[in-house]
């Protein structure tokens, strides 16, 4: 019973936690006409978000495919914003792993609080020669 209570409490806290702030991301990005923000929708609850992440990893979804096409543009700063860090990461990973062409001088901005997510994203970005800016959320 105690384990169930701990599990339910942690799930509730996770569900109530706020996602990355769009304002926080916008303040870190360059203020020029070569900056775009990709708004990533989320499913609304942790279970549905988990299913959405699995779908994005395999099929990409609209946001993942849009990111893959944006990565082909030269001199572009791309911010990824949404209420779910796991969905944001899945979109970023799909875009980086499936971009057929990557433009010159492309940078990607993402807000999160996971060191492992940061390492995964930086590794994928480096493989595609994309400058990754992972802003640690406090």
Protein language model regions, located:
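Positively charged n-region of N-terminal signal peptides that target proteins for export
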Residues: 1-4
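Post-signal peptide N-terminal segment of mature Sec-exported envelope proteins
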Residues: 24-45
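Structural motif
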Residues: 39-44, 79-86, 108-114, 136-138
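Mature extracytoplasmic domains of secretory-pathway proteins
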Residues: 48-107
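C-terminal motif of bacterial Sec signal peptides marking the signal peptidase cleavage site
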Residues: 12-15
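C-terminal partner/receptor-binding element of secreted or periplasmic proteins
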Residues: 111-138
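Bacterial signal peptide processing site
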Residues: 17-20
